[in-house]
């Protein structure tokens, strides 16, 4: 059996490039907050940046291109015609943006913007956020060891159901790209041997040869000897993303890391990595790779070493204290809230479920009416005000617990009902929102319906995936929105 996690030739910006402007957050974040991406674009200006070689999903599927099947189903996407904004990127069509991305990638490869920073090695990542210091190791996974079909029991597995309609527009972005920039984070179930790691204080280069002997806490052990590694970058991240440092894991240390994960692979029972973030991004990489294999353009020998066979990812330890599972909320817009709530209650009854007042699923929405009728009668109603104290519309919320759901997750029940509702209410749009405050603000801004959920216990993730295949889509998020992965490292995928 070949290793599913391997070293890579990793590209990074050349010396002198502003790393803070280079690194931007994952493209699937802030999909309903155009102000965020406008601020990023303004901040980056003309500097070399990953903003120029990724496609923020808020701009994917503009009105002009929906007729070309490039729309992003269910993403709450807004374009410049809808928002009134005229930024450079908001004004581009999908095809224009993709062409620009491909051209800019080629330019960065030829004009010295990118250089090979690590040869046949890994990058140890140290990310500091409000949740703490989150560690990771960036390397290549073999896409032949991954599948987003829950029936396939591969070494690398999706954690949520893949929305097939979301793949084609992403394939269009990736299929002619020269490089990839990962925001995919995979999780490994690797309990930490704290005693062994604490014994590495004041580590020397000789300690690197012991990595392969580490049975628990591989990433944490490598971090314990970080002072023996070459620092690659050290920068603040824009827009409240915290701080990030990267270290080159090369030579003997890289060989030891490969051996340590190979040993973990041999003892994992056939399930080594779960996709923590970037399920659809990795599904896109897999689809592109399968398309290449089917194209007939390459021999079997050529396919073995084709760059697109592998995807660059960051591996994180499920047991890290700084790796927090956060809920992903729902935002429904263009909706008759009373109609949706009636539908929800009817479906709960139809499924033989019972509910009581609680906080497993909380609906929040703007109630129409005057301020006189907005006087709060109980703690479940909040009157919103302008800065000058004038009453606007009241915000109502109501929460439930489902008492007889057994092993089913509240998000599973909710998403099933929402999917059914959306099938017969084509004008209603759904978006997936990270963070309580963001959803509170969007409910007021859009006059839609926000649905708040609770986080799941991360210790249940691997058993749940191993037993049942996948969780409902958008069940959890690694950290808050500004704690998601920022683009930094690059990997060449064209031949």
At which residue positions do the language-model features occur?
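Catalytic or ion-translocation cores adjacent to nucleophile or general acid/base/metal-coordination motifs
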Residues: 279-343
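Active-site beta-strand/loop microenvironment that shapes enzyme catalytic pockets
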Residues: 254-296
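Intrinsically disordered, low-complexity terminal tails and inter-domain linkers enriched
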Residues: 66-83, 368-398
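A residue-level signal for conserved active-site and pocket-lining positions in enzyme catalytic cores
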Residues: 174, 186, 278, 442-443, ...
